[in-house]
Amino acid sequence: MWNVDVTCIGGIRSGEATLRPGPNIVQASNFQGKSSFLAAIQTAIGTTGLLTEDHPLMENEDDGKVTLETDEETYTVSLTRATDSDEPAISRSGTPYLTRDQDQIAARLFAVLGEDNPIRAAVREENQERLTELLKKPLETENIDLRIEPLQREIKELEDEVAAAEAASADLPAAQQKVTRLQGELRDLNETRDELERKVDEETDQRALRDELTAKQSDLEREEARLERLENQVDRRKAQLDDKEAALESLDIPDSPTAEADIAEKQTRIDELAVKIDLLDDLHRSTKAIIDEGEIDLITDVERTLSGDTFSCFVCGAETTAEAVTERLNEISDRQESLREQRATLTEEVTQMQQRTREIESKRQQKAELEDEIKRLRVDIQEDQHEVRSIEATIEELQAEIEQREAEYEAAEKAGESHSAELKTIQQKIGSTETKLDRAQAELERIEAELQKRNDRQEQLETKRDELETLRQRRKQKYNELVNQFDAAMADIIGRFAPGFDGAYLDQKTDANDTVGFEINLARDGHTTDLDTLSEGERELVGIVTALAGYRTFSVGDRVPCILLDGIGQLAAEHIRHMIEYLENTAEILVTTAYPEAGSFDGETVSPEHWDVISHETAQSRDHPQITN
């Protein structure tokens, strides 16, 4: 049971009412505060001021307030008009029934079904694009699309890196062929040199000096090439180290969540609660139906007296009354609601714990990989630098030895000894070819390193693609459920209302950019038709069904136990009754409006007789329209 106390909201200066489980019909003529009362309930549950809408503070009043008292809590929400600006803004304070943005948006779209409901308005205006935007709103509050977009960018970057590495791999055959060719040329040059040397007198000192000098020069060129290659390698590894250290420093790992055992325990508890809720629901529904229909005598003996009917309890056999059974049913209903709240809380906790665990594990793995790579790079750089120093020392020694050998060789040459010009040319070619071979081998090593980098990036790419697919499946699941709920609700509505069309379908379409859109299509006389062919009442009916599909898909009933229905004057009185009967089992509390000429309804009638509301004449004298009916 809800008690609602209203001050200066819409067209109600002051008023209060009690809402009970089941249908609650606010029945009155125009300008008696029907719609304003529903706006007050909206204010209390926290669904006003959303989607560029204003809070419903009474015009020319600076303050308004709504107090909602439930069986468990009391919620007070105040509205205040700022008076220090040219265009006064209305702000909200206090704690509404719903505090999370995600819950408020879902309730505004799918539980507050007044004439200004955004879903109904989009259907009424045949705005399929706006309808798509609104149906996707709850998933936006889960940040699914916001998480998909950066993932797609990361995947694109990784794909570009892999493609670049693939391009580098295309150079691999040419690099391998170049190394093989230079090795063959060097082998041929060495054979030619050996042949020429055999023709030279190997007994002369000049021969020995020449061989020694050539060997030293070859050693020097080889060491210089090694030094250049190592220095370049050190520079590359230092750059990689800086990148890895920067990435590690920017990596933020949240605190570890509860252990997996807690998640399993909570999931077990959720399953247990679901069983209990279903059992209580079956008991409540069947027992209430027997009591409401006055069919107690079907299952037990009823003793009818002037003071009231009594009968034997059909469970324990004790004597009881319908009022006592009804009171017990209310207690069962309260127990159901408590179990639903526990289940919703546990479900939210499990979802958050699982998501947090996945994020932490991913970041820990990333951190471990970065630390391993940093450690390896540091060791490699240290080893390279040690080798650089060793090579530099070797080069200094070789340069000194070459200077000495050149002086000795020049002295021997002056003594009349001469070298073969052809042999000198071959020896020079050997040194040049050895240098080219060293450089070709270095280039081959670089390309092979790029191929290894490609493999690493490919693994990262697969991980990101899996994560993206998980998010897309979550989104697809909700979208499919939305379509199924629409189809099921529309089938029920057609059976109850017999409208002038055969069926309505919520079609889901995905474009080349993986963007999902929704479109309502109708069937009439075996042909597909548009919303503009419907009557005003039929269009409102389709809008309400669309909102109800969202209500069930996004479990809005687990967030707020009520549905507010207003602005259904386009429906005939019998159709209003059908709508109330249809919605009665959808939410614990149903609040709707009706005119007196619609007749009487089953359920609780809420009368505005004692409310202080703005009169029709006062409303007409305002500069701006005010919610009063």
Curated annotation (Swiss-Prot):
A Gene Ontology cellular component where this protein is annotated is: cytoplasm
Q: Where located?
A: Cytoplasm
Source organism superkingdom = Archaea
InterPro entries per record? P-loop_NTPase
Instruction: Please classify the protein's predominant subcellular localization into one broad category.
Output: cytoplasm
Induction comment: Transcription is regulated in a cell cycle-dependent manner, with maximal expression around the time of septum formation.
Residues folding into a coiled coil are 139-282, 318-487
UniProt keywords, alphabetically:
Coiled coil, Cytoplasm
Query: Please, what other remarks does the record include?
Result: Overexpression results in modifications of cell morphology from rods to extended rods.
Described function: May play a role in a late step of replication.
Q: Record's family?
A: Belongs to the Sph1/Sph2 family.
Protein's name according to its UniProt entry: Smc-like protein Sph1
What is the species listed in this Swiss-Prot or TrEMBL entry?
A: Halobacterium salinarum (Halobacterium halobium)
Q: Provide the gene name from the record.
A: sph1
